Each structure stands twice: as structure tokens, then as C-alpha cells.
Design a protein with these regions (language model features):
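Active-site glycine- and acidic-residue-rich loops that bind
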Residues: 158-169
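Conserved beta-strand hairpin/beta-sheet module of binuclear metal-dependent hydrolase folds
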Residues: 3-56, 144-160, 177
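Structured catalytic core of nucleotide-sugar glycosyltransferases
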Residues: 18-29, 69-79, 83, 131-133
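Cap/insert and terminal regions of metallo-dependent hydrolase folds
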Residues: 167-222
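Active-site metal-binding motif and surrounding structural segment of the metallo-beta-lactamase
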Residues: 47-92
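Active-site neighborhood of phospho(di)ester-bond hydrolases with catalytic His/Asp-centered motifs
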Residues: 40-43, 63-71, 91-94, 156-160, ...
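Metallo-beta-lactamase
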Residues: 94-144, 149-152
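A short helix->loop->beta-strand "cap" motif at the edges of active sites that frequently abuts
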Residues: 36, 86-89, 222
């Protein structure tokens, strides 16, 4: 099931965000300043990503960092390929890196020399970006969202999420810009063609966020 990226705002004068893919076919996002940028998840093909950069008049040489939220294939398919070709460090928690190593769907294994490790709740400074990963419930090896501060604003991204925790609410409330999952209408899901076990997975607290819960999280915390 495809989810939709909900944008509170899209750009500022100095900080810009582009969604290159959102859904089960591949997820990839780009956040950048005038000097440098970072990619969040690389679940699209590398040729597709290169074309999208060209279409926006951008160059992959402006990318300095890669952040990964979790180890499902639609978020990591090309992480090893892009890291190798562009010599990009890949930042993720140790558990997510372990999951990437075990995932047979990625097009190229990630080089150990390109791995960088993050800890949920602990901020790191990467160039212009102050980045704090935080835990998000989802049925991956581990899953995080990111609070990213740059150019005087606070950006928050939550991709796959089964439910909203108090910690997530705190990060949402601090955000000037929010990207968050809105995956499905509950009744449409229940009456739809998916097998029962998949419906139950999607609706579970480690599955995917329904449209109503997404709307409530925004209304109550922003």
C-alpha cells in the first residue's frame, strides 16, 4: 500500500526538501541547503535517482551524507550502490546497519568503511545539520525518525510508523517542518482485497499509520 508524504511546509529560503519516492515501490528524500545536502533512505533505483537529480537541476556531488530510517527493502535498495559510487557515508543505528547487511534485496552490499553509527536520542552534528534520531514503532529490525536542525529551523521526518508515542509527539511539537506517514483509511483497508494477515499487520501498533491517527498527531502537536 502506498503512503502519502504530508508536508507541513516544503521550503524555506535556505533549506529545501524533495521527495523522490514515497511508497512500497521505493522511498527517498533529499534535504539540502545552498552548500550541502543529505539523502534520507534510498529505496529507489540508482538510475532513477540520478535522473531525478538532473530533472531538478541538482548534482549528486552536493550530497554529503545518507541517513537510513530502517532496513526494509523499499528504504535501502540502492544504499550500497550510491554509497560506493559517490563515496558517501551512511548513518544509521547499529541495529539498522545489521539489518541492511542481512537484507538480500539491496543491489550492492554496503562497505564497512562507509558505515557510521547513530544512537537514538543522541544528537550529532554533520556539517550544517544537527541530527537527532528517535525511536519509531515499526516491524523492522529497528526504526527511527529524524529531527534535523539547519538554517535556524527544525525539520522532522517520520516515515513508516505503526503508532504515535509520547517521544514522537515531543519531536513533532518542536518541528517547523514535518514529513509524516499517512498510509491508509481504516475502513477501506478492512474492506479491501488484502489478505487478513496483511491487514492485521498494517493496522498493528508496529505497522503503518492510518490517515486519522496522522491527522490527530498533527492537530494535537503542531
Amino acid at each position: 500500500m502506498k503512503y502519502f508524504v504530508l508536508l507541513h511546509k516544503i521550503t524555506t529560503k535556505m533549506l529545501r526538501f524533495i521527495s523522490f519516492g514515497s511508497g512500497s515501490s521505493g522511498n527517498c528524500y533529499y534535504l539540502y541547503t545552498e552548500e550541502e545536502g543529505l539523502i534520507i533512505d534510498i529505496g529507489v533505483g540508482i538510475r532513477t535517482l540520478k535522473k531525478q537529480f538532473r530533472d531538478y537541476g541538482l548534482s549528486l556531488s552536493s550530497v554529503h551524507y545518507v541517513l537510513i530510517t530502517h532496513d526494509h527493502a523499499d528504504h535501502i535498495k540502492s544504499v550500497g550502490s550510491i554509497s560506493h559510487e559517490c563515496q558517501l557515508p551512511v548513518y544509521a543505528t547499529p541495529n539498522v546497519h545489521d539489518g541492511i547487511d542481512r537484507n538480500y534485496c539491496i543491489t550492492r552490499k554496503l562497505s564497512p568503511s562507509m558505515k557510521r553509527f547513530l544512537e537514538p536520542g543522541k544528537a550529532v552534528q554533520l556539517g550544517a545539520f544537527n541530527i537527532t534520531p528517535f525511536s519509531v514503532p515499526h516491524d523492522a529490525t529497528e526504526n527511527v525518525g529524524y529531527q534535523i536542525k539547519a538554517e535556524g529551523v527544525t525539520f522532522c521526518i517520520i516515515t513508516d510508523a505503526g503508532s504515535i508515542t509520547d517521544e514522537m509527539r515531543s519531536y513533532i511539537s518542536e518541528a517547523d517542518y514535518l514529513v509524516i506517514e499517512a498510509n491508509h483509511d481504516v475502513e477501506m483497508l478492512r474492506q479491501g482485497p488484502y489478505p487478513q494477515h496483511l491487514k492485521e499487520r498494517i493496522e498493528s501498533h508496529t505497522g503503518h499509520l492510518c490517515n486519522r491517527d496522522c491527522a490527530v498527531a498533527i492537530a494535537e502537536n503542531m
